[in-house]
Structures are given as structure tokens and as C-alpha cells.
Amino acid sequence: MTQLNIAPTPADTAAANNNANAAAGAKQVARWRVADIVALYELPFNDLMFKAQQTHREHFDANTVQLSTLLSIKTGGCEEDCAYCPQSVHHDTGLQADKLMPVDEVLAAAKVAKENGATRFCMGAAWRNPKDRHLEPIKDMIRGVKAMGLETCVTLGMLETHQAQGLREAGLDYYNHNLDTSPEFYGQIISTRTYQDRLDTLERVRDAGINVCCGGIVGLGESRRERAGLIAQLANMEPYPESVPINNLVQVEGTPLTGTEAIDPFEFVRTIAIARITMPRAMVRLSAGREQMDEALQALCFLAGANSIFYGDQLLTTSNPQAEADRKLLERLGIRAEAAQQMPLDQSGCEHSCDKHAAPN
């Protein structure tokens, strides 16, 4: 999958910065190269933030965020060996594996999420890939959540073509399937699923007409260039994802990444800003790891272009700031919670090749 977008070509550090300056304001030119994104990382912090905020305001109300709730509908027992994940059977984290939640319990949780202000309800199941029989109750969940007027998203692992089509027919708005990291660093994080496996699932989702939710995790021990490689992969998709969750590693005792040096907070903010610049129309979602951030750091992330947060008491198997604290922070910042600002793939004037795939609005 390829994406025509902005792409300066730096020759040295000074030229790289000049090209990065031009890139942020340019329209469609060419693919993003890893070196171009490294050049953005190397900009002075204030310059990068200014460019990200300019880009953000061109496409969104800078003082609104979407509130999303994520529910783990099937926890633990996953066959994959992702080094960061406590749900893997390969890691001794003390996590108790559970079966798929009943439909009525999921819908009850969605009702509470809506009452608390969420407009997007995400359902995650710890599978390598679901069996067809698993999808029937999930389709009922999707229909029930949509009937409440909530945007729907699921993350279930790898999908076959007919499975993606079935989820689309049930009315699914978004399918989440993260790349996690760059192709170069990927082998140090997971061995049970290839990078191409992930790209293939994303292509099936796109071909089915479902909006793509795809991002990654930073703080895994990757280098800046490898972080840039992740952003390049995302930004060069055709089209780039409508939804881009940026996760900050939450270290869980018993996983191989326990003890990994944490990413510098400003580097995390830079990553948010660069996601906004390179994917200007995407919803950039401040995801896992937010509980590790103080309020000032979260505010910088909003300034950098994050316009969605996962909201509530639990984010899959890691804790998340409580809903009341979130409400107070947003109020102090003058940020309003609003409904989804979804990017339709067939919108006129779309910056990337929109005519290839249709998606629900």
C-alpha cells in the first residue's frame, strides 16, 4: 500500500530542516521518506509544535477532542509473543484469561460509556485471529453499540477477507490493527506474526470498506530513526489511516520489556506532532500510557495535535486516568468533548487517493 503525500528530500542537516519547514505547509507531492521524518524530529521543539498546530487547525477545531472508551471483551490467552503485552501466553504476568464477554454485558458497558460522554466505543479481544464462530456475537455487539449512536471499533487480530466483509455488513466503523513499530525494529518485539501479516489484514479491512485505525507504540527501546520508520509506514499508506493511536509503552512486570528505558516526554510529544503533520486529516489518538503523563504533558500532546483520548477507568489491561480527572483537565484547558470528526474516504478535495475505496460515514 502506498501513499502520495508531502516529501522533501534532505541532503544535509541544514537542508533537512529547510525541507521539513516546506513539507509542513505543502500539499500532495510525494512519499514521506524516513529521512524527511527524522528531519522533523530534529526541528527545534517550538518550531515543530507551531507547524503541528498550524496543520491541526487547518483540518480540525483545535479545542475539541473525541472521547473514546475501550473495553477488553476477551482478555488474555493470546498465542502471539508481543514483548510488550501482558495478554500473551508466553509471558508470566499473573493475568487471568477470560472468555468472550456476553453481548448484554458489553452493551451495558457501552451504555455507561455513552452516559459518561464517550462517542466512540472500542472492543478488543486477545486473539491471534478470530474463528468465524467468534464473530457472530461480535457482530451483535457492533449492531447494539451502533444503535446507541456510538461510533464502533473492534480489534480482534488478523482477519480473512470474508471476515472483514462480514464486520462491514454488521455496520463496523473502524477496525484497529496496529503496526506497533518500524519494519526494522519489529523483529525485536514479535516473532509469531510478520509485518506483512499486519499489512495484509489492513488491506483486507480497507477493501471491505471499513475505516482503518492503525498506529503504534513508542518507548519499546527503538531509536529515533525507528520511530520515524513507523510514522513513514503509516503516512505512506494509501490512504493513510483515518485513526492513528499513539501509545506510550506501559511496562508490565513479567513481560520482556520490563526495565526498558522510558522515552523522553518531549520525544513523545514530538511523535504526536509529527503524526499530525504527516497525516493531517487523521484522528490522532492519545492512547495507552496516558496515566504515566502529568497534566502538563497531556496538554502539550493536545497542542501537538492529539484530538482523541481513551476515557474511563480501564484501557484493555492497563489502567487509564479516571473519567472525573479527565473531565476536570479538559475543562481547565478549555477543551470541549465532541462527537467524532471522521474523515470520509470519498470526501471531495481529499488529499490522497480516495476513489479506490469507499467507507461508511
From Swiss-Prot:
Its cofactor is [4Fe-4S] cluster; [2Fe-2S] cluster. It is an enzyme of class 2 (transferase). GO terms for biological process: biotin biosynthetic process. It comes from the Bacteria. Binds 1 [4Fe-4S] cluster. The cluster is coordinated with 3 cysteines and an exchangeable S-adenosyl-L-methionine. NCBIfam families: bioB. This is Biotin synthase. The gene is bioB.
